[in-house]
Amino acid sequence: MAFIAALGLLMAEICPAVICCSDGTLGMHNAVQKGQDTQKQLDSLTLASINTDFAFSFYKELALKNPHKNIAFSPFGIATALNSLTLGAKGNTLEEILEVLKFNLTETSEADIHQGFKHLLQRLSHPGDQVQIRTGNALFVEKHLQILAEFKEKARALYHTEVFTANFQQPHEAMKLINSYMSNQTQGKIKELVSDMDGNTSMVIVNDLFFKAEWMVPFNSDDTFMGKFIVDRSRHVKVPMMKTKNLRTPYFRDEELKCTVVELNYKGNGKAMFILPDQGKMQQVEASLQPGTLKKWRKSLRPRKIKELHLPKFSLSQHYNLEDILPELGIRELFSTQADLSGITGVKNITVSEMIHSTELDMTEKGTEGDAITIVGYNFMSAKLKPVFVKFEDQFLYIVLDQGDLWIHVMGKVINPSEK
């Protein structure tokens, strides 16, 4: 299984005046330590819980705007890009971003939030020799625009952000530079993150997340067959259906929400949770998505023998303009002329004109090589439960999680596995 997520923020100068020239380069800088000695560091599990809250809020808005489409997005990627932007946001612009990301400054300081992300990014940068996880941030700046040294230093130290200069007066040249960078970062998976740009753009921030892992118990490709998948009451499609028999894996039947939850582990640091609502119950399950729901599912999962598991093989490619989505959640000023990003340039002359998020997700029988881990916590009584058959032949949800902190890397919904 592999996924790649990328996000781009296009910013424009509100005023057309030319600002002092900057070379846009960065030197080496030690990690920012401000606040760490006096503030309690944000616990990684708390950070993951906050991210889950944001992830589910964002998902619900996506589902509302895309009721009949597959969904794939990276809450981690979006949160990382937005949070790096808070290094330069001020006033109400900053407050709106933090509120939508579910942070409460009365409980956690900005310094602790940034330190929490920094340590998480450091951990993800060293997942082990076999697991492939890579994150990256890049800032493309108009060659005549001056970026504050403090912002560049913190962006580099906390979010591993690279800074490049670009000639946005030549939009096609700038787009070529950005898309070439993203293509290299995503191994050619995302070749055209930015497809349109005008001469008013002065800054672009992009974020990418690459994750690839192998199932702990891979599906046998010889068992994959063409099976029926129900798109809606009047339509079904034939899709490649992966199959495995006599699998022992975490399972939970949620009678309250009328859905079945199955968890499959990856070799290495990750797991995938698949949620199959009973027919006609998808909206009920979606409405219930909140951190407490995920916590309940995680606590209720028990090893269970699945006599036969069917899961469609699918490949999704989704592209979202977040300037149409985030204002509905509460981030409005960022996309208006009232935006205050003076912590980036020193003056209030930058606004975000476009924010793009792209995700490529492949769910296959095997994946790539990785270190094996051992499933723990078996319940002796579960051996007395009858084996079950689980067939994902109707629309379902999926959540890819970090094994340790339960951070949501990617999540979404499959309505039609035959469509990208």
Curated annotation (Swiss-Prot):
Q: Which residues are glycosylated?
A: 104, 349
> What SUPFAM superfamilies does UniProt report for this protein, alphabetically?
Serpins
Q: Which N-terminal residues, if any, form the signal peptide?
A: 1-17
The UniProt site entry described as Reactive bond is assigned to 381-382
What are the coiled-coil residue ranges? none
Q: Which UniProt keywords apply?
A: Glycoprotein, Protease inhibitor, Secreted, Serine protease inhibitor, Signal
Report the Pfam families cross-referenced here. Answer: Serpin
Q: Does the keyword Signal apply?
A: yes
Region RCL: start and end of each range?
Answer: 367-392
Q: Which family does it belong to?
A: Belongs to the serpin family.
Q: Under what name is this protein listed?
A: Serine protease inhibitor A3B
Q: Please tell me the species this chain comes from.
A: Mus musculus
Question: What gene does the UniProt entry assign to this protein?
Answer: Serpina3b
